Amino acid sequence: SASIKNNFSFCWYQFYKFLFIFTNRWRKEVVDLETFCVGILVMLNASHNKDFKIKDLNLKSYQKLVMSSDNKGLNAMSISDITGIPRPTVVRKLKYLIKNNFLHINNKKLISIDIKGNTYKRSTNLQNQNMISLSNFIFRVFNQIKVINSN
């Protein structure tokens, strides 16, 4: 705790450095951060489904498992209410994500995660790059605050 206080600015600098790298990667993939927020909200809804339980912590299988976990989905109005983004804008962002094979809309107009084809390969690559960046962030912070004992 004292070590974190002594390195407070360093820790925040490393965190923001990671956050900017993470968001810039996704912004390049999905055009803007509002689209990313809409997509990540649908992903969070799927991963926080009470029926979604992971027995084996495996990054490669996680993305496939989370896609089949949400049998209901979210509607555009709910996404708008949660994010504060106007509904017409949410609808435009959803159309972009559906057209680019990130999301799926069912006959009840509910949106769920469904990453397919080339988009799946690109998002898996982004996920891997972001995990490396997260690991680097954790390594730098833990190394700086001397959490890991070298003895």
What is each stretch, according to the model?
Residues 36, 88-89, 95:
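Key DNA-contact positions within bacterial/archaeal DNA-binding proteins
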Residues 58-61, 75, 102, 107-130:
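Short, cationic-aromatic polyanion-contact patches
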Residues 37-72:
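Short helix->loop/beta-hairpin flanking segments within DNA-binding domains
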Residues 66, 71-81, 97:
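A short alpha-helical element within helix-turn-helix/winged-helix DNA-binding domains
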Residues 1, 119-150:
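Short, amphipathic alpha-helical interaction segments positioned at domain boundaries
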Residues 1-37:
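N-terminal leader segment of winged-helix/HTH proteins
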